[in-house]
């Protein structure tokens, strides 16, 4: 399976180059440019990309008195396994730090947790979401 080349957190050691055959729109090209050039503390592929949004959800929950459950978050299967696990772990910890419930997207499709071929979680996923396997 060909991987995207995007790692978490950014920036990458080697700049990501957009394939011209993909005809990417200007927003995606701008994202790639910032991903390639901004340091981790300002990178769109870092915890800071979602930390403020999670703080906003916590503030909304406190203000209105309703709990917030993040019904879907995930990382595309074509990201490298180490970055996927790191993203899931970082997002989960950030959500829990704000007292927000969460669920991943999805069980066994393009953002999969479960590997149907092996009958086990995808590499690093169980540890990222629940801690060490026994």
Segments (PLM) and residue ranges:
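Substrate-binding clefts and catalytic carboxylate motifs of secreted carbohydrate-active enzymes
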Residues: 1-134
């Amino acid at each position: 399976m060909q991987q995207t080349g995007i790692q978490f957190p950014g920036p990458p050691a080697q700049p990501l180059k957009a394939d011209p055959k993909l005809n990417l729109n200007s927003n995606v090209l701008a994202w790639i440019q910032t991903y390639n050039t901004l340091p981790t503390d300002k990178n769109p592929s870092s915890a800071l990309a979602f930390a403020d949004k999670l703080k906003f959800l916590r503030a909304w929950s406190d203000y209105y008195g309703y709990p917030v459950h993040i019904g879907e978050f995930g990382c595309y299967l074509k990201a490298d396994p180490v970055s996927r696990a790191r993203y899931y772990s970082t997002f989960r910890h950030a959500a829990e730090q704000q007292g927000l419930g969460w669920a991943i997207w999805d069980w066994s499709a393009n953002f999969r947790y479960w590997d149907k071929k092996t009958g086990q979680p995808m590499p690093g996923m169980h540890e990222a979401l629940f801690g060490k396997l026994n």
